[in-house]
Design a protein with these regions (language model features):
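Short, well-ordered, aromatic-rich surface patches in folded extracellular/luminal domains
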Residues: 1-18, 88-119
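Charged interaction scaffolds used for protein-protein
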Residues: 12-13, 20, 45-49
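Extended intrinsically disordered, low-complexity coil regions enriched in Ser, Thr, Gly, Ala
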Residues: 34-59, 89-102
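A surface-exposed partner-binding patch
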Residues: 38, 43-46, 118-257, 390, ...
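Elongated alpha-helical scaffolds
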Residues: 70-89, 245-248
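Compact, glycine/acidic-enriched structural inserts
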Residues: 278-309
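Low-complexity, Gly/Ser/Thr/Pro-rich intrinsically disordered linker/tail segments
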Residues: 297-357
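Concave beta-strand-loop units of leucine-rich repeat
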Residues: 326-341, 351-369, 378-391, 399-412, ...
Length: 524
């Protein structure tokens, strides 16, 4: 492809973007990059009278990315486009790879799939009942009004047409009980808090919040901490909710004003119910919390708490009522963080991190026998930090996905064939045999920078490996052997700033960005 043809294609792409502009727009910014499912378009329109309006996918983006990358000799490309009506537009293409400090990322848009994002869902029917939900809401509002001494105004109802349009934009039909709620009140109106101390979003706010959560979810992934990024913990009841940080099937319908929401789950796991309610958002670092099997059950529960007297009246102005949400239950913590293993671990424990109470040299710490973990059937993460583990075979029947540990003389042999291990951060003093890594079907992340390794050649056979961290000397040996893992997406040279020559051998190109400028017509 010639430069003139490439420039023409870039101008046509900008014209296609602005052809879909909303009325009254005053500017836009769009970034296009490769992703696991094809090109990802992250963009927004500036529109007077409100916040940014998120931009949807643009036709032809993938083809243009590929054409520019091929013409420039890049592994991949990243596009940024900015403009305003009647003003200058800027179209910039850069290599899609990123070199930062000691790490090169060949595909910055890559997000490793979470364990249960696309597993088969529930075949169970919804648990909600529209009539019962509305009856519970009305009874709750009457009871609260009596306690507060004033009646609160609900918002006007949404029309069936407004509800249908919101569902079209969401790509989901809402559960019948939530639909009935919106056909009664589109938002909280004059109520201080309609559901569990939170405001009911309007339908327009619901769509905006859902789009924001989908956008923000792309930034949860971090190459340096796979345990947090890709091994979410599972909420109770087990098997009801997908183990994800976020999901397109989780539709927010309330807000606390600080980034936390109730959401209806329209993609439940096998033991869940369509329309079950989750607590998601900024404060749920480990993933969602299960709240109720339906909006109906949530509203009925609130009415029950009110009728049983599980509430407190706050003297602020305006006065409000605060429900005691968990008067009967203290859930077990799913994480353990201490200097030793728990003496009596419960069945809900999913993450164990062992940290010394005071700084201690690794060699001064006694090896840790993992045998007690046999009683932890849902263990997903095990982080021993600097401790050496003995009894690694204990982990064979457990669903562990992330392991950071020192290895004893048995090396990796006790882990051979483990079906779930996806991320390994290892340390050892004696030369390590990497052959057992070939038997780990889920392995995608590996840090051997704290290991002595007999032969790094086996790494070239790990077709599923996406991340590899080695020392500078280990990288030199691996590249000399021409044994780079074939599907590598990110690489780290531990203890040294990544040199351009090393990065180029990994796949990071040298080359200047490609830039086109022009004028946009008034109004697009």
């Amino acid at each position: 492809m010639t430069d003139s043809q490439l420039e023409q294609d870039a101008r046509e792409f900008v014209a296609a973007v602005t052809a879909g502009a909303p009325e009254g727009w005053t500017g836009f910014e769009l970034t296009v990059k490769g992703g696991p499912g094809g090109p990802e378009c992250d963009g927004w329109w500036a529109v007077p009278g409100g916040g940014p309006r998120w931009m949807r996918a643009v036709a032809g983006a993938g083809e243009l990315l590929a054409a520019i990358a091929a013409e420039r000799g890049w592994h991949s490309a990243r596009l940024t486009v900015r403009g305003r009506p009647g003003g200058v537009f800027e179209f910039t293409a850069e290599p899609g790879t990123v070199l930062s400090g000691d790490t090169v990322v060949l595909d910055p848009g890559y997000v490793h799939p979470l364990p249960e994002e696309s597993t088969p869902g529930s075949a169970l029917p919804p648990a909600g009942d529209a009539a019962r939900a509305l009856a519970a809401l009305r009874a709750f509002l009457r009871g609260r009004a009596e306690l507060l001494g004033e009646t609160e105004e609900l918002a006007p109802p949404a029309t069936p047409e407004q509800l249908a349009e919101a569902e079209r934009r969401l790509g989901h039909r809402l559960p019948d009980d939530l639909r009935a709620l919106y056909l009664t009140t589109d938002g909280s109106g004059g109520t201080t808090s309609l559901i569990d101390g939170r405001q009911l979003l309007t339908l327009d706010e619901m769509v905006e919040a859902a789009e924001h959560l989908r956008y923000a979810g792309k930034f949860r992934f971090a190459w340096d901490e796979p345990g947090d990024a890709v091994v979410p913990l599972g909420p109770r009841p087990h098997g009801a909710v997908r183990r994800c940080h976020d999901h397109p099937g989780w539709v927010p319908f309330t807000t606390d004003g600080s980034g936390n929401h109730h959401a209806v789950d329209l993609a439940p796991a096998a033991a869940g119910r369509p329309g079950q309610v989750l607590d998601i958002g900024a404060d749920n670092y480990e993933g969602p919390l299960y709240v109720a099997d339906s909006v109906t059950s949530l509203l009925v529960h609130h009415l029950d708490l009110l009728e049983r007297g599980h509430y407190a009246l706050q003297d602020d102005w305006p006065p409000y009522l605060l429900l005691d949400q968990d008067p009967d239950e203290e859930p077990e913590e799913p994480e353990w963080n201490d200097d030793g293993l728990p003496e009596a671990a419960g069945p809900d424990l999913q993450s164990v991190r062992i940290t010394p109470r005071a700084p201690v040299a690794p060699l001064d710490l006694a090896p840790l026998d993992l045998a007690p973990l046999a009683a932890v059937p849902r263990l997903r993460r095990l982080d021993l930090v600097t401790r050496t583990a003995t009894g690694l075979g204990t982990l064979r029947p457990l669903p562990v996905e992330f392991l950071r540990a020192g290895l004893d003389g048995a090396g990796l042999a006790p882990l051979a064939g483990h079906p779930h291990l996806g991320a390994l951060d290892l340390a050892c003093d004696t030369p390590l045999d990497l052959a057992p890594l070939r038997t780990l079907p889920a392995l995608w992340w590996l840090d051997l920078s704290r290991c002595a390794v007999a032969d790094l050649g086996a790494l070239g056979e790990l077709a599923g490996l996406r991340y590899l961290a080695l020392t500078e000397a280990q990288w030199a040996q691996l590249l000399e052997r021409d044994a780079l893992p074939p599907a590598l997406v990110a690489a780290r040279s531990v203890g040294a700033v990544a040199a351009a020559e090393w990065a180029a051998r990994i796949g990071h190109p040298a080359g200047e960005s490609y830039r086109v400028e022009g004028l946009l017509a008034e109004g697009g």
